[in-house]
UniProtKB/Swiss-Prot annotation:
Family of the protein in this entry: Belongs to the ViaA family.
SUPFAM superfamilies in the cross-refs: vWA-like
UniProt cross-references to Gene3D superfamilies, sorted A to Z: von Willebrand factor, type A domain
Xref: SMART domains: VWA
Alphabetized PANTHER family for the sequence: PROTEIN VIAA (PTHR36846:SF1)
Protein name: Regulatory protein ViaA
NCBIfam families referenced in this protein's UniProt entry, alphabetically: PRK10997.1 (NF008230)
Protein origin, superkingdom: Bacteria
Gene giving rise to this polypeptide: viaA
Subcellular location: Cytoplasm
Family annotation (HAMAP family): ViaA
Keywords tagged on the record: Chaperone, Cytoplasm
CDD domains: VWA_YIEM_type
Keyword Repeat set for record: no
Taxonomic classification: Bacteria, Pseudomonadati, Pseudomonadota, Gammaproteobacteria, Enterobacterales
Length: 483
């Protein structure tokens, strides 16, 4: 069967122009205009999706099949082009019957054209084929437009669903244009409103805990660029204004330390005549420590000196992915659980904004893994937030899982974050030594987010940074009172 793409080539129908018109109409639709005004960051992300839409429409037109009636009419037209005028006159009755049987839009006009001329000439033969071709072009264009209209409705429905999802999550997860683009890419999954409302719920909880949010931001910025002075700095000329006593004596305004011999105090001048104090006088003269009269009159002059150019190189510290281990033991339930999940959501926001990866591992009796920054990040985040913390605490297994992942090439510069109350058994010696080796040799950083003031110091001593967020009732009341 004839494909629509082949028909367009045969009749020289420009499908690119039709596709561009459809995309322009889609972007100009009122729904998108209102959305772009409300969420300007997502406008660029949706616009970046246009090439994908264009390619999908091309593929759809290429694979579409032409109706059998139109296919048969096109075949008849191609055969008629090969006929000479006498042959065409012989075949004309069959051609007209075929057009009538196929209900072709050209059938009635073709019969009227033939009936209006008693003799079929070569010019009439050419005119007949030209008008027939125009009719086929109109039919092919109409078929393209119908197909593109169906695709436009389907695409608009898909975009509206993704806009609803992205619009709900943009205030929570999109901190800049990069994050907005990644959020839009994630919204392509099949999600229902009730699913992503869980993210909205924990986003609202995070806004109610600004201290927890700031803690996540500080952890995310813990690898700032460091400035390093250059050792090979060149000398440069530096001009400065120096204030000096006026050469013309004026009113005495007080005393000062200087090397002005002409205005020495008599006691200072007397030391010059004492042999034992002569060297002391010269030392103080060189160091400008002699007591002299300070005149009221002052003047400024320009002094030219040379000094090293103070330029600095910046050692950009790598900001790698996050590997976050969350304690799901029973002691981490309730408010601790809410804080841990909200903290991971804040790290996900940072990862999206800085184009980093965010990998979550839940540890208790077994380890469950989620990647919140992947193409299915929203679905993974919903699954993670749906988990309940009711297991035991196996901190050693958590560290072993972290170390195993850190040894792979794609995670070599990752930061490990452990969220727990750290009320657990001490770590085995082999785990402790391996962590120290990773810190010393590979410069991996281990962060602890302590949800309790009663964590064991012996466990927490292994971490590079300890971020404390006490979830006890007293600390919660104090934070609320300060706000």
């Amino acid at each position: 069967m004839l494909t629509l793409d082949t028909l367009n080539v045969m009749l020289a129908v420009s499908e690119e122009g039709l596709i561009e018109e459809m995309i322009i109409a889609l972007l100009a639709s009122p729904q998108l205009a209102v959305f772009f005004e409300k969420f300007p960051r997502l406008k660029a992300a949706i616009t970046d999706d246009v090439p994908r839409w264009r390619e999908a429409l091309r593929s759809r037109l290429k694979d579409a099949r032409v109706p059998p009636e139109l296919t048969e009419e096109v075949m008849c037209y191609q055969q008629s082009q090969l006929l000479s005028t006498p042959q065409f006159i012989v075949q004309l009755p069959q051609i007209l019957d075929l057009l009538h049987r196929l209900n072709s839009p050209w059938a009635e006009q073709a019969r009227q054209l033939v009936d209006a001329n008693s003799t079929i000439t070569s010019a009439l033969h050419t005119l007949f084929l030209q008008r027939w071709r125009l009719s086929l072009i109109v039919q092919a264009t109409t078929l393209n437009q119908q197909l593109l209209e169906e695709e436009r409705e389907q695409l608009l429905s898909e975009v509206q669903e993704r806009m609803t999802l992205s619009g709900q999550l943009e205030p929570i997860l999109a901190d800049n244009n990069t994050a907005a683009g990644r959020l839009w890419d994630m919204s392509a999954g099949q999600l229902k409103r009730g699913d992503y409302q869980l993210i909205v719920k924990y986003g609202e909880f995070l806004n109610e805990q600004p201290e927890l949010k700031r803690l996540a931001e500080q952890l995310g910025r813990s690898r700032e660029a460091k400035s390093i002075p250059r050792n090979d700095a060149q000398m440069e000329t530096f001009r400065t204004l120096v204030r000096e006593p006026a050469t013309v004596p004026e009113q005495v305004d007080g005393l000062q330390q200087s090397d002005d011999i002409l205005r020495l105090l008599p006691p200072e001048l007397a030391t010059l005549g004492i042999t034992e104090l002569e060297y002391e006088f010269y030392r103080r003269l060189v160091e400008k420590q002699l007591l002299t009269y300070r005149l009221h009159g002052e003047s400024w002059r320009e002094k030219v000196i040379e000094r090293p150019v103070v330029h600095k190189d910046y050692d950009e510290q790598p900001r790698g992915p996050f590997i976050v281990c969350v304690d799901t033991s029973g002691s981490m339930g309730g408010f601790n659980e809410q804080c841990a999940k909200a903290f991971c959501l804040a790290l996900m926001r940072i990862a999206l904004a800085e184009n980093r990866r965010c990998y979550i591992m839940l540890f208790s009796t077994e380890i469950v893994r989620y990647e919140l920054s992947g193409p299915q990040g929203i679905e993974q985040a919903i699954r993670f937030l749906s988990q309940q913390f009711r297991g035991g605490t196996d901190l050693a297994s958590c560290f072993r899982a972290i170390m195993e992942r850190l040894q792979s090439r794609e995670w070599f510069d990752a930061d490990a974050v452990v969220i727990s109350d750290f009320i657990a058994q001490r770590l085995p010696d082999d785990v402790t030594s391996k962590v120290k080796e990773l810190q010393r040799v590979h410069q991996h950083r281990f962060h602890a987010v302590a949800m309790s003031a009663h964590g064991k110091p012996g466990i927490m001593r292994i971490f590079d940074h300890i971020w404390r967020f006490d979830t006890g009732m007293r600390s919660r009341l104090l934070r609320r009172w300060r706000r």
